[in-house]
């Protein structure tokens, strides 16, 4: 009998018992809904196992290391990792608390005259002994009384540290505080290190000493159901089932014995937020193979369909929220300002008066307060804006990636409806060579000179005068490069916003290269100078944007044109230890402005979180044109026209970074941002966007349930979209190469 059939029968039996007790006729029972198929969604779960040999200096060991460790070193024959600082921390999982023998091997820093390196072991905050590290194996036992089922923290506290810089009298540039070069840790847990969690053919195999964590919201009445639980290799063992609601303590729900037939285990109250369901295979004795769960699912009698699935990006807008029929604007201008942070505009709360024309435009438009970029560098983000596809779908993520000809761009969609299309761009990353000219009758990469935004205006004015045939509406894409580095504002704006900056080397790319390689220190004075130059460039672009608005008014186009003002990404100004963009996925590079002026729409501020992928469907909707099914964004036209509700606390935006050695992914909600750094030896971080908008306090460990829940959503988004389009490889001509070098993308 299947677990769901058994669940229905159990529910019916309860009602029959109620009848016998005189409770009246039972209400009809709905079949239970599957909240999660634990085999189908195994790739969304987190899997842990008890530690065995931790080979320090290898990527595999990094999953256990937290603070107090340097980078991996060595070669194929010998690898190690230095401690860095007075303590090093290790986090490891145990299926069950018990005495664990531990072997430690490392070599102390070779400091002349230094005493023996004594290392104190603190386990979950309790001192459990001391070992001397001498290059040979040191042995101890981690006592059961200080251990616990689940996560454990082991801190290695060193008797002394030394700095190579100080030891060499300043000749070394190594400022680390070193104590031990660690080779290995060996936990004698008896875990099968070659084991693996497998899910296939309706069977979920879980080795002893391993755990599966599944993250989801559970509706009332949720149960764990499976056809059977069996053991492998003759071991007895049992399955420990535990549940941890967000913000609450983990509680054991039950222990299941193999061979007892179909299972329906009520999970109890999980609250309304995310919860972690943990399944741990416990051995009846040390060693053994593990357990097999047959067709395991999470189910509930009245689970809403939305609970069962990871939220999808939606393009459809309910009929009740569709824009009302009536006159439609004819033309569209997409004005993109490269590398512009939202928080450096007055209309977004910035105190310096760098954006009076943009602010005036915002007062007669719809300002989206929270807009998330799909990447932190130009090409993937702009490709998303121009296609309505997420980076994992359009495939344009790397330095040489070119948009597939199979992709359908916004320009092509409008061209097919009779629109004249033109694009004038100033960043080589969106040159025709990268496929972004698809659907444009005219598409020009302008050379950078003077104020690039002014050049763009001149090109646009010329096209409106002589290139645009007034027999049909137009779509005009204008991509301005300032305030993208290098910061070279025109003299009037530099004199106003950066009058104290006299060092001309700050207006080239070399200053950023030196900051990156450490040959130039980011002093407060230097940081302020660069910030002033950045603001001066914003002011220059603002003035040019004001001229464009005046041009539209003079040409009689203002009342018949949708104007979309947006940025591709922001700019880091050393908030997280770096400069520019394309290196992280923090707020300063992902939070961008989006201001839309649609004739007749009025002015308002929308608090709902939106994202760049929404721009293309929004433009189509405002024009009264159909949105192709391939488009992944959601039309914002109902919010622009004041016909939709406000905030959505569960709205999610996904962003990716995969270029020049920087690899990361993130999911952003109005309350949280999870960043998963996918570089070697990296991890994940979680930030409370309300309490910590600057994203400086990592809560990933403290809020592990929320972290796992958001990560599952991120992985599900990637699973749905991976490999949708295959990017091509771009070919650079010499002129494009020079442009990319000038912007710092090539050296």
Language model: regions and residue ranges:
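Bacterial N-terminal signal peptides
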Residues: 11-21
